[in-house]
Every structure is written in structure tokens, then in C-alpha cells.
Amino acid sequence: MEHESLINGVLKNPNVMGLCLYDATHLPDDVLADARRTHPMLWQGGSACPSSDYAPEDVLARCNQPLDTNPGAVTYTVRGSADLRPARSFAADYAGWVGLSRDGLDDLQMIATELATNSLQYAGGSCRLAFWRHNEHLVCEARDRGRLKDRFIGHRRPSARGTASRGLFLVNAMADLVRTHTSANGTTIQAYLRLNPARDC
């Protein structure tokens, strides 16, 4: 549902329309209720009509739940720009150990750099990077003390003239999955990269 809510906020183009299919006969009522909250238009009786329950911000707020960190994760704290290069090397060493592909390793280093740089620039403090394996993915997590006020940052294409949100946009483009939690106590972003299936660790 979070993905559905974000799409409508990102693709605000009257010339673009998509049709999402839901089996109203068999799906639970709560799933159908969320579908009405995350879709501005509903197809009923052969025609489209506005959804009176449309409330994507409410759904995003409900999906904004704390994310668990693996207690066995390896960590690296970035306190300034001088720590970025060592952080990339740290990420590369762990990626090689768990079997991430060469292309995936390059993506991981870029993701770790962009997440840490974003924390340094906008959170006003250090960034704690953590890495661990989750099933067939490598997770790169960034935690800081800042608060992400715009949930669409990183999903909208950044302005050609500006640099704000460009890093998070790249993270979302390179990772297989990005999860975010933000509150007054700080922000956590987790980026998932698929491991090389040819190697079993």
C-alpha cells in the first residue's frame, strides 16, 4: 500500500493513467479499504468515479513503522566527509565476503556514499551505516538524527538545476528495495541489493 500511495504522489500527470486490478470477490475487506484510500479513481459499474475514501497521506503515516536492525550487522559510523572513502572500502570488503556481484558492489558503494552524504548534509550529524545479509539480499542501512519531512523525496525525479534529493533518487534507482522510517528521533533508510545467486555463503 505504501508503494501505491507513493506512485500517485510522484506521477501527478493528467495524461498518465494506470489500472490496478483487485479481486473484490475474494480479497479481505481491509485490503479493499486500503485500495480505496490509495487510488483517486475507482472503476465501478463500467465507469470511473472519484474515490471518496482517497487519503494517501494517512496510508503513508500508517506504513511509517520502525525498521529492525540485524543484531549481527557490521557497522561503520561516518562523522564527516573524510570518512566517506573508508566507508566505501568497508562496504566493499563486506560485499565481497557475502558474495555480491561486481556490479552490485559498485551500486553498494554508491548507495552507502549517497546515504551517508545525505545524512551529513541534511541531518546535521553523523550517520551510522550497517550492513547485513537478509536471505538473498545484502542490506545497507543508514541511521541519523534528522527527520525526513517529505516522504516523496527520492521518488520524484530531481530538478535538473538542483542537487537536493538527487542522492536519495539514485539510491531508489539502484536498490532492489528501499524502506524508510522517520520520526522526531531520527531517520532510518534500508536499501536491499540482490546477492549473486551463483555463490552460496
Model-inferred region functions:
Residues 3, 112, 164-167:
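Amphipathic coiled-coil/heptad-repeat helices and related helical stalk/stem segments
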Residues 7, 91, 115, 142:
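Aromatic/hydrophobic pocket-lining residues that form π-stacking "cages" and hydrophobic walls in ligand
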